[in-house]
Amino acid sequence: MSALRLIVGLGNPGPEHAQTRHNAGFRFVDALAERTGARWGLDSKLFGETAKAEIAGHTVWLLKPATFMNLSGKSITAALRFWKIEPEQLLVAHDELDLAPGTARLKFDGGHGGQNGLRDTIRLLGHGKFHRLRVGIGHPGHKDRVVPWVLGRAGRDDDMAIGEAVDAAIDALPLALDGNFNEAMKRLHTPKK
């Protein structure tokens, strides 16, 4: 499996969205940039903010699309073209309703599962053959409550759990960057004793 070269966090831009559950992907790449000392800069040709990070001996591009969640594919595909990166070398971090807060899961390939940022990316790529980091935000219990749930802020306990999941995913990332995606999955998916 190809080593990762681009890590994208999905979210909505602007301070009013900064702490929402839907911005779990932004939270991941922001934490990654902070841990590595990478600095964000606006890149209008890529429709987002970019940073260059050094992680475990690998140079990786970070991207936060500024297009709003539903149009994330525009920024992602522009970055893939500009940096000549294959979709298989892409990791997209996003919020996941079907996972409890405190849970993060890596996967490769698949559908969008109702996540509109993934939906747009898959539509523009023509396939779903890229890596994903699913950051659990929990489900409100009924589909009619999903929109206010994802656009709302998590309570203190859930917010702490999401932060722990982000940290665990960052800790597993060097394995994925080395091309050992299955080992990274095993590390992240195995409960700590």
From Swiss-Prot:
TRNA binds at residues 17, 68, 70, 116. Gene3D superfamilies: Peptidyl-tRNA hydrolase (3.40.50.1470). It is found in: Cytoplasm. NCBIfam families: pth. Hydrolyzes ribosome-free peptidyl-tRNAs (with 1 or more amino acids incorporated), which drop off the ribosome during protein synthesis, or as a result of ribosome stalling. Catalyzes the release of premature peptidyl moieties from peptidyl-tRNA molecules trapped in stalled 50S ribosomal subunits, and thus maintains levels of free tRNAs and 50S ribosomes. The active site is at residue 22. PANTHER family: PEPTIDYL-TRNA HYDROLASE. GO terms for molecular function: peptidyl-tRNA hydrolase activity; tRNA binding. CDD domains: PTH. The lineage of its organism: Bacteria, Pseudomonadati, Pseudomonadota, Gammaproteobacteria, Lysobacterales. It catalyses: an N-acyl-L-alpha-aminoacyl-tRNA + H2O = an N-acyl-L-amino acid + a tRNA + H(+). The keyword Lyase does not apply. It is an enzyme of class 3 (hydrolase). Its EC number is 3.1.1.29. One of its GO terms (biological process) is rescue of stalled ribosome. Monomer. The record marks 95 as: Stabilizes the basic form of H active site to accept a proton. Keywords: Cytoplasm, Hydrolase, RNA-binding, tRNA-binding. Belongs to the PTH family. It comes from the Bacteria. The record marks 12 as: Discriminates between blocked and unblocked aminoacyl-tRNA. This is Peptidyl-tRNA hydrolase. GO terms for cellular component: cytoplasm.
